[in-house]
């Protein structure tokens, strides 16, 4: 880590903490995993943990957001606006995304943290006060419906 710049160090720390947390979640209940045990398993210091994350849940939330943003970027690149059947492609692509990352999302499910997936999914849909109520309700309904599908499917 000596020759890394700050961004590279943070990326290294974040990746090792995430990997260690997911590994610990295979053998321990999420609530019983201490920050000290996590940083020891990751081979990083507590200060490095708190420089990057507010909590263990934050580690998983940030990964969920990162994965979803990566999916969205790839989908938008492969299917620019106006692609015929884009709505159907979007749904299939999203369901495939969750299948491809089932190990991560199943870890959330088994830890009782499915709400992280739900929050990330709902964050994708505009439900802001600036849009008409009907559209906000529709976006919420679609988000919860997709969450239900994925939750049951896994």
Spans of features found by a protein language model:
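Amphipathic alpha-helical packing segments from all-alpha helical-bundle domains
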Residues: 89, 93, 109-144
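N-terminal intrinsically disordered/low-complexity leader segments
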Residues: 1-10
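Short functional hotspots where side chains directly engage DNA or cofactors
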Residues: 46
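Hydrophobic alpha-helical connector segments
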Residues: 76-103
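An amphipathic alpha-helical interaction segment
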Residues: 100, 137-152
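An amphipathic alpha-helix adjacent to DNA-recognition modules
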Residues: 11-22, 26, 31-35, 40-43, ...
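Cytosolic nucleotide-binding catalytic cores of signal-transduction proteins
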Residues: 25-28, 127, 134, 149
């Amino acid at each position: 880590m000596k020759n890394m710049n700050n961004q590279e160090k943070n990326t290294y720390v974040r990746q090792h903490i995430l990997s260690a947390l997911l590994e610990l979640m295979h053998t321990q209940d999420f609530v019983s995993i201490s920050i000290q045990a996590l940083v020891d398993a990751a081979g990083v210091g507590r200060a490095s943990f708190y420089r990057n994350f507010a909590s263990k849940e934050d580690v998983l939330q940030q990964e969920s957001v990162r994965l979803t943003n990566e999916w969205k970027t790839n989908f938008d690149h492969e299917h620019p606006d106006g692609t015929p059947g884009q709505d159907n492609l979007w749904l299939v692509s999203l369901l495939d995304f969750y299948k491809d990352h089932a190990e991560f999302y199943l870890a959330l499910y088994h830890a009782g943290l499915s709400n992280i997936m739900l929050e990330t999914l709902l964050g994708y849909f505009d439900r802001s006060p600036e849009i008409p109520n009907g559209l906000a309700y529709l976006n919420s309904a679609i988000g919860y419906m997709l969450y239900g599908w994925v939750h049951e499917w896994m």
